[in-house]
């Protein structure tokens, strides 16, 4: 997404880039077109590089699949990396990163997919340590975030959250109430 970096330097907002087809949905489209094997090899190269630089532990998040198959693909790659390399690797399920285009008019249906399809399979295959949600206007509301976090906790995942990147809508409080390990972004207080 190099062009998006240039767009940010030139003054476009994250929301303007997303509205032009960039951002998370752009990455999701590319990820879903990539095979699990190719994704593993791409990720392996990056992992080798950070290990050579002295990194002792990494967290790798999903969140760019936004489909059952795409999210599971990412998490399976992370699990395979963790089993093949001596570095500590923690996996975070971030299926609630954005709403896929298919669900733009039925957001609750996507939340049902996360809770009833993704989370059970993630738990069954032991694919993640944490659950993360992007709680922000235009993404996941406070109520939706709370519902997803609660479901993740039921499956043994420790919560993390992305909040207050553009607006303060109450996400920090949900993180505190649910003992989130971290609340990230915090660009707007």
Predicted ranges, named:
Residues 54, 127, 178-182:
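Short loop/turn motifs at secondary-structure junctions
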Residues 1-42:
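Metal-associated gating/positioning segment near the N- to mid-region
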Residues 25-44, 48-49, 56-170:
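Metal-coordinating catalytic core of metallo-dependent amide/deamination hydrolases
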Residues 158-159, 167-189:
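Active-site-adjacent C-terminal substructures of enzyme catalytic domains
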Residues 3-4, 147-148, 177:
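Glycine-rich, phosphate-binding/catalytic loops in enzymes
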């Amino acid at each position: 997404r190099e062009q998006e970096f240039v767009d940010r330097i030139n003054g476009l907002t994250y929301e303007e880039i997303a509205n032009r087809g960039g951002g998370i949905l752009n990455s999701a489209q590319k990820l879903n077109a990539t095979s699990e094997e190719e994704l593993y090899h791409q990720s392996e190269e990056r992992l080798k590089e950070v290990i050579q630089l002295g990194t002792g532990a990494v967290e790798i998040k999903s969140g760019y699949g936004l489909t059952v198959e795409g999210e599971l693909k990412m998490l399976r790659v992370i699990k395979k990396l963790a089993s093949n390399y001596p570095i500590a690797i923690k996996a975070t399920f971030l299926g609630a990163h954005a709403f896929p285009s298919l669900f733009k008019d039925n957001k609750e249906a996507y939340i049902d997919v996360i809770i009833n399809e993704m989370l059970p399979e993630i738990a069954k295959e032991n694919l993640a340590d944490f659950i993360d949600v992007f709680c922000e206007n235009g993404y996941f509301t406070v109520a939706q975030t709370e519902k997803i976090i609660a479901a993740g906790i039921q499956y043994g995942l420790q919560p993390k959250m992305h909040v207050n990147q553009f607006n303060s809508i109450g996400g920090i409080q949900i993180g505190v109430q649910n003992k989130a390990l971290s609340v990230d972004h915090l660009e707007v207080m």
